[in-house]
Regions:
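Short coil/linker segments at helix-helix boundaries
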Residues: 47-48, 73-130, 134, 144, ...
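Terminal, low-structured helical/coil segments at or just beyond the last alpha-helical repeat
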Residues: 203, 207-215, 219-228, 275-313
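Helix-start (N-cap) detector for alpha-helical repeat units in TPR-like alpha-solenoids
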Residues: 28-31, 64-65, 139-140, 191, ...
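Short coil turns that delineate tetratricopeptide repeat
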Residues: 61-62, 133-137, 172-173, 222-226, ...
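Alpha-solenoid helical repeat scaffolds
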Residues: 68-69, 140-147, 176-182, 195-196, ...
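N-terminal leader/linker segments that initiate helical-solenoid repeat arrays
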Residues: 21-111, 313
Length: 313
């Protein structure tokens, strides 16, 4: 009888212990490792990803990687790709994947374009807002949302620009202690990140994207009036987009007062005056490039052109 009681007690103990053991919470690291393996195999919205993320967030509701994963899940799931025909030779700054001419010689250009499911994309934005509220000074999380908006809006990046302007204002007025999982966030890092979007919008080549380029460059100059990068951007806007040499020269001249050997401004002035056939002014900036050119090739080619204009052989 005593032996039977021992066995029964052992079974009761096992019944109380085993369920607890089965419910042991996985570590953050184990969730992260499993997530990375699954993403590598099937992408951010692959099979089983949503279930894993739900379990991860149930155990660790504020885990930054899990919150990011949830955003990426819905963003990826919202996307579908199609090859579409367009009349222009470039779309969003990209070359076509294929071009075909019909029997009359009319050429159509085919581009791979992403399209978005509205409901899923809206859910992705809600997840983005949640992770930003939880980690307001994780600058990479803000850029994830902005990148999503940029992809979604394509050549009319109104919401993306609004987010970027808000980010610029927040950075300048609140001076947050930005963090990033991979990089130290310095002033140069922030400037480079904003400039990357300026370049993207400029390359899109549409009226709306060019305006976005101007708005961002001007906003940065509102806070950093002597920033050479954005002064050059404004010069490029007036020269290449608006065909306004007078306004462009104002910005390039400001750059060269701050940095007399700035090759971007010098090269732009050479091109501007060569285009307008103003030989006198072109020679002025060729002399500067021959002296301050960053490469030997720049210096030599400028001198060759200068000699030609001066009638030398």
């Amino acid at each position: 009888m005593k032996k039977l009681n021992v066995i029964i007690c052992g079974l009761v103990l096992a019944a109380t212990v085993l369920p607890a053991a089965a419910q042991t919470t996985d570590t953050r690291e184990s969730y992260q490792e499993r997530y990375e393996r699954m993403v590598q195999k099937g992408g951010a919205s692959g099979l089983g990803i949503e279930t894993l993320l739900n379990r991860w967030l149930a155990d660790y509701p504020d885990d930054a990687d899990a919150l990011l994963g949830k955003f990426l899940y819905y963003y990826s799931k919202s996307q579908s790709s199609q090859v579409v025909a367009k009349e222009q030779k470039k779309f969003l700054g990209q070359e076509p994947v294929l071009s075909l001419a019909d029997s009359l010689g009319k050429v159509s250009y085919y581009f791979e374009e992403l399209f978005y499911d509205e409901a899923l994309f809206s859910r992705a934005l809600r997840e983005a807002d949640k992770m930003i509220r939880t980690y307001p000074d994780r600058i990479d999380l803000r850029f994830y949302k902005i990148a999503a908006l940029t992809g979604y809006e394509k050549e009319n990046p109104d919401q993306a620009v609004a987010e970027l302007r808000g980010l610029i204002d927040y950075n300048a007025m609140q001076h947050p202690e930005w963090t990033h999982p991979e990089y130290q966030v310095t002033d140069d890092f922030f400037v480079a990140a904003i400039q990357e979007y300026c370049v993207t919008f400029y390359r899109y080549g549409t009226p709306a994207s060019h305006e976005a380029f101007r708005v961002l460059a001007q906003r940065m100059l509102d806070y950093y009036p002597d920033n050479i990068i954005f002064l050059n951007d404004m010069g490029s806007y007036y020269f290449a987009v608006k065909k306004d040499e007078k306004s462009a020269l104002k910005y390039y001249s400001r750059v060269l007062k701050l940095k007399k050997d700035d090759n971007t401004a010098i090269r732009s002035c050479i091109l501007m005056y060569r285009t307008s056939k103003n030989v006198k002014q072109e020679k002025k900036y060729l002399e500067m490039m021959a002296k301050y050119g960053e490469s030997e090739s720049d210096r030599k080619s400028s001198q060759v052109r200068l000699d030609y204009l001066n009638g030398k052989k």
